[in-house]
Amino acid sequence: MPVKVYAEEMEGESMKKKKLSETPLPKIKKRKMKNGDTEDLDLEHMAESVNGEINNNNPTPKLKKKKKPAPISDLSETAEECDGEQPDPSTPTPKKVKKKKIKESKEDSDTQEEAEQSEPQTNGVKSVKKSKKNITSDDNEPAPKKRKTDTTEITTAKECEEKVLTKEEQDINQEKIDGDFSKFPLSKETIKNLQAKGVSYLFPIQSKTFHTAYSGKDVVVQARTGTGKTFSFAIPLVEKLNEDQQPLARGRAPRVIILTPTRELAIQITNEIRSITKKLKVSCFYGGTPYQQQVFAIKDGIDFLVGTPGRVRDLVQNYRLDLTTLKHVVLDEVDMMFDMGFSEQVEEILSVRYKADPEENPQTLLFSATCPDWMYNMAKKYMRKQFEKIDLIGHRSQKAATTVEHLAIECTRSQKAAVLGDLVQVYSGSHGKTIIFCDSKLEAHTLATSCGSLKQSAKSLHGDLQQKEREVVLKGFRQGTFEVLIATNVAARGLDIPEVDLVVLYSAPKEADAYVHRSGRTGRAGRTGVCISLYEPWERHYLRNVERSTGITFKRVGVPSLLNVAKSSSADAIKSLDTVPADVIEHFKEYAQELIEQKGALTAIAAALAHISGATSIKQRSLLNMEAGCDTITLKSSVPIHSLSYAWQSIKEQLGDDVDSKIHRMCLLKDSMGVCFDVRSENLESMQERWTDTKQWQFTVATELPAIQESERNFDGPRNRGFGGRGRRPFDRRNNSRNSNRGGGGRGRNRNGGFRRGR
């Protein structure tokens, strides 16, 4: 009866364990802990005591020599050495025996199997296993087990962290995999030139369009600005021309023509193509430059011709520019090209090479950030029937750049120039690059020459400048000669100016497409940027139209607070101190010591930072409408309110009935949990002294504009501009007869046709 014998042995060993548990182990543990030993050493001593009891209290010297605790997995070997017996190789470890004991409690067949396997074991091993179990129950959790569990937890935490990091970088890693150079038929020379420019893989737009363009198919590509559209057609066409191995004879006609709407974009594309090929001849033709140099280029021979429609057409008509051998035609920024009235010029240029049968026409590639329906209809006119559409934006996704934060600030026209300096200082700093877009040339010139709030150097860029002047301005801006570029729409499309931190639209964006391109001057090539739109109260509907068309959401913010301006100015001032040479500092230490003795170290340094940053006079402004000398107050309620009159009543109860003349522009918060209003800075202190917060109302000075409910007033036009309400009957100013379409007066409000004088 092996099972019965095993059970009796178990009972005997259990009695021994009970006796051992009565030994004064806790005292030994307390003494050892007092001497600075760990709980692991107690475990060792207890194992020795157990083995000594089993082996007539003769512990093995080996255990006394050990300073480090033995792991639980090695406890059986230690016990066997204590018993003075040689370990049997066939003997399983206590861990395995423990598993067999668990099986014993499940089924009788398992119990029989376990008993047969346990018969060859010595009594000493069994005793040690049971003693270990008793130790575990007495000391709750042995230290080695805790260490093992903690290690597992740490490993799991590291694995989770690695998973999170992998998820964040998954998109970038996938782009690198998809754009790996080995997946494309690129020559060694092209790869070398790309790597010299810091390009280690093709961007998504480049990888997705390469094979289509390389195979000779017609394609229409829509992608956001700043995603690398130039290389998406330049790289495959360079490889195609290199494969042709056509003799590069003098006077050869161009095989590729690239038409762009602006001169600046043409120059940029030319430089990009030249950077990846040294063998092929790339020429750039645009207006505002002498014809002679361009005629010499035609006689010398051209492979890539980049130009604007007007100048290219003139060269075709008057200087024998041969386009009959064109194999590839690229139209970049197609929507803008046709919006600017270049459609007739483009058709004249293409008619030289395009035939009635589309299959005989050259490969046509259209690229744009926006692709309206009319553009697809135009594509059918020049392209083969089986042309491809590659849309990297989609109809439902955001069409503007995703790396740009879109902000909107409401202020009147008279206040825009005054707050412009603070916006540039906070969002770009003294050393960042900013582009300010204006609607007119006069406005751009005026801001560049007489905007007193701008501390940074600024220059204007508009159509009245000669081409040479425009190139000098753009070159200076790229090289950091000045920090602020004030431009008209000439700089809105296609220009790849690196590291632009801020874009400011001096007026509300009227068209969604124009906003997409203007805001796309920042946040390029993986960088982040900010685009701020300044709008007047009556221009809110323009923002809503842009939001609906592009899928973005403007974040309504106020002008930077006094604290934010001081913080940004101080950061720039501290940064500028690093540029002062050490030998120069030595000459100023004596005067610095005198200043510290006079004013104190803290006051002296603060005054120096303010002067260095140019922030000697910082005006507090309203966050609601940018009016100087006003503070914005937030009065938060513990319960929702739906009427301003309720807030007025509570304010008058504490501050008196005359307070209504001191509070301006009150409006409800967006969540209806309070109101927001302006007070004059000279009245703020007295209000704070008289006001006492209650359970319902909390009075705070706002440091940033809270989300407020937009008022619908003034949506029918500018306030006090002389436009009436309901009447729409025209009139003539000279004879007061209603036969002109310029008016529209309010019926019964003014006898002079509805045009009222501003109050």
UniProtKB/Swiss-Prot annotation:
Family: Belongs to the DEAD box helicase family. DDX21/DDX50 subfamily.
Catalytic activity: ATP + H2O = ADP + phosphate + H(+)
Taxonomic lineage of the native organism: Eukaryota, Metazoa, Chordata, Craniata, Vertebrata
GO molecular function: 7SK snRNA binding; ATP binding; ATP hydrolysis activity; RNA helicase activity; rRNA binding; snoRNA binding
SUPFAM superfamilies from the UniProt entry: P-loop containing nucleoside triphosphate hydrolases, RNA-binding domain, RBD
Record field: compositional bias (Basic and acidic residues): 710-719
Tissue expression remark: Widely expressed. Expressed at higher level in stomach. Expressed at higher level compared to ddx21-b.
Ranges of residues in domain Helicase ATP-binding: 210-389
EC number(s) per entry: 3.6.4.13
SMART domains membership: DEXDc, HELICc
Protein name: Nucleolar RNA helicase 2-A
Any GO CC annotation of this UniProt entry: nucleoplasm
